[in-house]
């Protein structure tokens, strides 16, 4: 269970082994139409804010990832840091890009910091990432985590190419349009985050 729940992604990006989310994911989530996908597939993203819509017990976490797309296939290098336990997790995700907007369902394997596989992808577990907005500096994404047929709940993340900071006005507007309040998100600048930029930039 821990390698699965270590994913967050986000893209791409899960919480931690104690994230405890439950409940169905929202069914009305759609990617932004007409979004230039190059705005999203543009280097390493850092999760600067996140909102778990149905938490039970959630450890604070930090996450970064680099998504790349080629021929309709998305691959991600994902790094996660549990700031309470001071533990790190590494994953590689892969999935197919949908035909409308930037949305993909991916499976992931667990690797070490040199990308050597520790545990292969479980075909029953996956995450669906939907890009709601993205510009040159920040993005808003929705993530639905699944363990087998069970949804683990909605997760919204605000991404930036900087490790800390506020999202752009465009992304702030997208947060509001989604019926969310940025003040309800966890701001990761308070978590003493560490990152492995060498892993995500490989």
From Swiss-Prot:
Entry's localization field: Secreted
Single Gene Ontology BP annotation: vasodilation
Keyword Secreted: yes
Main location: secreted
CDD domains associated with the record: lipocalin_NP3
Keywords attached to this entry: Disulfide bond, Heme, Hemostasis impairing toxin, Iron, Metal-binding, Platelet aggregation inhibiting toxin, Secreted, Signal, Toxin, Vasoactive, Vasodilator
Bridged cysteine pairs (disulfide): 25-144, 62-193
GO annotation, cellular component aspect: extracellular region
Gene Ontology terms, MF aspect: histamine binding; metal ion binding; nitric oxide binding; toxin activity
First and last residue of the signal peptide: 1-23
Binding site for heme: 80
Pfam families according to UniProt: Nitrophorin
Source organism superkingdom: Eukaryota
Tissue and organ expression note: Salivary gland (at protein level).
Cited function: Heme-based protein that deliver nitric oxide gas (NO) to the victim while feeding, resulting in vasodilation and inhibition of platelet aggregation. Reversibly binds nitric oxide (NO). Also binds tightly to histamine, which is released by the host to induce wound healing. Exhibits weak anticoagulant activity.
UniProt similarity note: Belongs to the calycin superfamily. Nitrophorin family.
Subunit field text: Interacts weakly with host coagulation factor IX (F9) (inactive and activated) in the presence of Ca(2+).
Record protein name field: Nitrophorin-3
Organism ancestry: Eukaryota, Metazoa, Ecdysozoa, Arthropoda, Hexapoda
């Amino acid at each position: 269970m821990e390698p699965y729940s270590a994913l967050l992604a986000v893209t791409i990006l899960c919480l931690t082994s104690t994230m405890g989310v439950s409940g169905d994911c929202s069914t009305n989530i759609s990617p932004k139409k007409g979004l230039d996908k190059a705005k999203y597939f543009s280097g390493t993203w850092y999760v600067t804010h996140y909102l778990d819509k149905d938490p039970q017990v959630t450890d604070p976490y930090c996450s970064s990832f680099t998504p790349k797309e080629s021929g309709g296939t998305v691959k991600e290098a994902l790094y996660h840091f549990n700031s309470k336990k001071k533990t790190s997790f590494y994953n590689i995700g892969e999935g197919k890009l949908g035909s409308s907007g930037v949305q993909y369902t991916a499976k992931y394997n667990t690797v070490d910091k040199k990308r050597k596989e520790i545990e292969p992808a479980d075909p029953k577990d996956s995450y669906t990432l939907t890009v709601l907005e993205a510009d040159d500096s920040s993005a808003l994404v929705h993530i639905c985590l699944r363990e087998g047929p069970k949804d683990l709940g909605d997760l919204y993340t605000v991404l930036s190419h900087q490790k800390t900071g506020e999202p752009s006005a465009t992304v702030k507007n997208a947060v509001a349009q989604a019926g969310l309040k940025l003040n309800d998100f966890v701001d990761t600048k308070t978590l003493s985050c560490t990152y492995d930029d060498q892993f995500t930039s490989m």
